[in-house]
Regions:
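C-terminal helix-rich "cap/oligomerization" subdomain common to oxidoreductases
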Residues: 1-15, 74, 82-85, 131, ...
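N-terminal Rossmann-like dinucleotide-binding module
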Residues: 2-63
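Contiguous beta-strand/loop segments that form the cofactor/metal-binding neighborhood of enzyme cores
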Residues: 2-7, 198-280, 310-322
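Active-site loop of classical SDR/Rossmann-like NAD(P)-dependent oxidoreductases
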Residues: 51-54, 275, 299-311
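Beta-loop-alpha module in the N-terminal Rossmann-like domain of NAD(P)-dependent dehydrogenases
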Residues: 63-125
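Hydrophobic residues in well-ordered beta-strands that form the structural core
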Residues: 85, 108, 133-135, 248, ...
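Rossmann-fold dehydrogenase core element
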Residues: 119-139, 158-165
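Predominantly a Rossmann-like dinucleotide-binding segment in NAD(P)-dependent oxidoreductases
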Residues: 139-227, 347
């Protein structure tokens, strides 16, 4: 949740005991985050838990010294100092609450909950336990999006009154649970739109949201609240108390002529700024500032950002940080997600 500078050598020089971490769910994303943490030298990959023996074996290639366990109970009682959760979305809230009530800090994949109520329950558990909680809103930690945030925060754009954010994924998830509303909480809005909502509200300073209008589609057909299908295309307009309007569009499996389109544009009374991917890449981004017809580069080039959110959480864990009041922002994002689904269901 913010800028970060990781300096492993400085941390190691303090000769503090490295945190022992437990990893619940080590599929592709969980294993990637585990590998980043293992390579950082900032913590020990102590315990791994997954329902798939094959996936466990793949994870042991990354962390051969780790202990494997068969249940979450065993992981929580293994003498660890924090939990990394990367399981299907429906399990996030309950698993996070259990860890927090056990006195363990939590880093969880998004979404923290399928609804605002689930998300609020986790945040309140963290508050009551006074434990560190964060989720993997990874795009906040790209150098390009942070550059745009600095420009907006500086006031260089004047009053920002409009934002357009897009995330089109030409492929979509490969795991079947993403398409089960009960297990995922929703489709592309829950998977991709959460990043757009978080980025927009973060840039604008989390103003209160006054009104949300949305339309959802599945395979080109309008989707309403009576369907059990999840959306693969969504568009929404969010009006805020600051006067700014936010336009969001996201999709899975859409023909966009490239792997993906990821972009955020912000327009103010004195200029604009943008964050966008390069040549359809999921990983490479640039940031620019606009002055009339002039484009001014802010940042470009290689940026090893995947996993950076977890490292920021880990750095704060090593500093013995406790509950972060900014966790309330997670509830604000979840409330907008709820409003998008509610608006679409009333059409």
């Amino acid at each position: 949740m913010g800028n970060t500078s990781i300096a492993p050598e400085n941390v190691l020089n303090t000769k503090k005991k490295l945190p022992r971490l437990g990893f619940l769910g080590v599929g592709w994303i969980g294993r990637n985050r585990m590998e980043v943490i293992a390579k950082s030298g900032l913590a020990k990959v102590a315990v791994i838990c997954d329902t798939s023996p094959e996936i466990l074996q793949q994870a042991l290639v990354v962390a051969p010294q780790a202990k494997t366990v068969n249940s979450y109970d065993d992981l929580l009682s293994a003498g660890i100092d924090g939990v990394i959760i990367a399981t299907p979305s429906a399990q996030h809230a309950e698993q996070s609450v259990r860890a927090l009530k056990s006195g363990l800090p939590v880093f969880c994949q998004k979404p923290l909950g399928r609804t605002a109520n689930e998300t609020r329950r986790v945040v309140e558990a963290a508050r009551k336990a006074d434990q560190l909680l964060a989720i993997d809103l990874a795009y906040r930690f790209t150098a390009a999006l942070q550059a745009v945030h600095r420009v907006i925060s500086s006031g260089l754009l004047g009053d920002v009154y409009a934002a357009n954010l897009v995330f089109h994924n030409a492929y979509g998830p490969d795991k079947e649970w993403f398409y089960d509303r009960a297990r995922s909480g929703g489709g592309c809005v829950m998977d991709l739109g959460i990043h757009l909502i978080d980025a927009a509200l973060w840039m604008l300073g989390f103003p209160p949201v006054l009104k949300v209008n949305s339309k959802l589609y599945t395979q080109g057909r309008h989707l309403n609240g009576q369907s059990n299908s999840v959306e693969d295309y969504a568009t929404a307009q969010v009006e805020t108390a600051s006067g700014a309007v936010i336009n969001l569009t996201c999709s899975w499996r859409i023909s966009v002529g490239q792997d993906c389109i990821i972009s955020s544009e912000f327009f103010g009374t004195r200029g604009g700024a943008s964050f966008h991917n390069v040549n359809g890449s999921f990983y490479d981004f640039v940031a620019e500032r606009y002055e009339g017809t002039k484009r001014i580069p802010l940042i470009s080039g290689p940026d090893d950002w995947p996993g950076r959110a977890g490292l920021e959480w880990l750095e704060r864990l090593q500093m013995n940080e406790r509950f972060d009041v900014r966790n309330d922002e997670l509830v604000r994002v979840a409330e907008v997600l709820d409003a998008i689904y509610h608006s679409a269901s009333t059409l």
